[in-house]
């Protein structure tokens, strides 16, 4: 099971929170489609800014969009011009005021999405894919991850038949739910077609604090009593 399912979705509520933080009984469908449109727009607008994730919080009168990025300068623009332009577009799209919060990713060399985007960009620039994969592998291990796996598939080096190659270092315990596993995906568009890049990173286990475990025990007792 752990080998097939998306490791992020499998661990929501265990090692990772939700990317959409809101509740609605009547407008659930409308809000869900709006969230998808917002994410697609931001990903296309800032495709070269290393956008890791977009967290959307909804309130009755406004929407908060928290944008986690490795390159905040590109997102902000000169004197905040990009932010103001994006806020206007999102306000038109959602018909509500939108607050755009930029959160910088501290160590992009250890984040799966940033690694996948870096590999895809270098493949588009005609860099040797094996060298690129090995470089990113070493950089991530030096950055502090405990395991990393990189998989690319497509017409590698312009070959007539598509194939896949992967490199792995450390361990990726996909069946361990408390393991902090991140997944990144990006497509490199080349003259021979698209090459898919997938990256898995493992950065240790989620250890619950003593206070949280005591609260959980109390909640279980209260429900069963």
Curated annotation (Swiss-Prot):
UniProt keywords, alphabetically: Ribonucleoprotein, Ribosomal protein, RNA-binding, rRNA-binding
Entry GO MF terms: mRNA binding; rRNA binding; structural constituent of ribosome
GO cellular component, one term: cytosolic small ribosomal subunit
KH type-2 domain residues: 38-106
Domain of life where this protein originates: Bacteria
Signal peptide segment: none
Gene3D superfamilies assigned to the protein according to its UniProt record, in alphabetical order: 3.30.300.20, Ribosomal protein S3, C-terminal domain
InterPro entries: KH_dom, KH_dom-like_a/b, KH_dom_type_2, KH_sf_prok-type, Ribosomal_S3_C_sf, Ribosomal_uS3_bac-typ, Ribosomal_uS3_C, Ribosomal_uS3_CS
Pfam families per record: KH_2, Ribosomal_S3_C
Keyword RNA-binding in annotation: yes
A single GO BP: translation
Record's subunit section: Part of the 30S ribosomal subunit. Forms a tight complex with proteins S10 and S14.
Family indicated by similarity: Belongs to the universal ribosomal protein uS3 family.
Function (record text): Binds the lower part of the 30S subunit head. Binds mRNA in the 70S ribosome, positioning it for translation.
Protein name: Small ribosomal subunit protein uS3
Gene name of this polypeptide: rpsC
């Amino acid at each position: 099971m752990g080998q097939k399912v998306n490791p992020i979705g499998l661990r929501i509520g265990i090692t990772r929170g939700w990317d959409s933080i809101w509740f609605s009984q009547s407008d659930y469908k409308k809000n869900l489609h709006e969230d998808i449109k917002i994410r697609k727009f931001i990903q296309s607008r800032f495709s070269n800014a290393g956008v890791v994730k977009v967290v959307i919080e909804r309130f009755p009168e406004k929407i908060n969009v928290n944008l986690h990025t490795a390159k905040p300068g590109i997102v902000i623009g000169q004197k905040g011009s990009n932010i103001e332009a994006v806020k206007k577009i999102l306000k038109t799209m959602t018909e509500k005021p939108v607050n755009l919060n930029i959160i910088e990713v501290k160590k992009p060399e250890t984040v799966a999405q940033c690694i996948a985007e870096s590999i895809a960009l270098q493949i588009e620039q005609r860099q040797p894919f094996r060298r690129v994969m090995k470089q990113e592998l070493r950089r991530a291990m030096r950055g502090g991850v405990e395991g990393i796996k990189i998989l690319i598939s497509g017409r590698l080096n312009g070959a007539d038949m598509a194939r896949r190659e992967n490199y792995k270092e450390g361990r990726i315990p996909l069946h361990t739910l408390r393991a902090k596993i991140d997944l990144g995906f990006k497509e490199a568009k080349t003259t021979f077609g698209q090459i898919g890049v997938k990256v898995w990173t493992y950065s240790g286990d989620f250890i619950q604090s003593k206070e949280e475990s005591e609260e959980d025990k109390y909640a279980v007792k209260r429900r069963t009593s």
